[in-house]
Amino acid sequence: MSITKVSPDLVDLDSGITITTADNTAQLTLISTDTDSGIGPVLDLKRNPNEAGADADWLGQIHFTGHNDAGTPEDIVYAKITGQIDDASDGSEDATVRWYIMQGGTRRESLSLGPSETVINEASVDKNFRVESDGNANMLFVDGGEDRVGIGTASPSTLLHAKGGSASSIIRVD
């Protein structure tokens, strides 16, 4: 590997860097000593500096990699986060960030945050979705295998099933 100092703030490497430690300490620490109210430190994943971006360009990925338990353990990307340009047009730039997780040996898109929608379970797998409130663990529950929605219940028996306490109104329509 060669390292070239391009400027006081820029170093050019001709290949990747591996940082290794033999314990659970951080392998990379970014420290900002700036004491103003601005954000710091900043990790910037930048693609093709000084080049025009294009629609559908992938901007970067963060991989969460570990070994499986095969006889000869294999590197598996168990989760990843990606960023992509949807529209590179000056003044109307759009992007999408996607979260992928390994499920049953296949990496699947779990969450997508795009310019016009947020999608959960784009891969249409049998995966439940649950929102808790302060007093209800199943305030909103989507049963991915049964294609049902529960409000106040984790076992909806119809397409939309609302369950309330004995003394409370379940649904109010004005």
Where are the predicted features?
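Short, intrinsically disordered N-terminal pre-domain segments
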Residues: M1-D14, L159-L160
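Trimeric beta-solenoid/beta-helix "fiber body" segments of extracellular/virion adhesins
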Residues: S15-D75, I85-D174
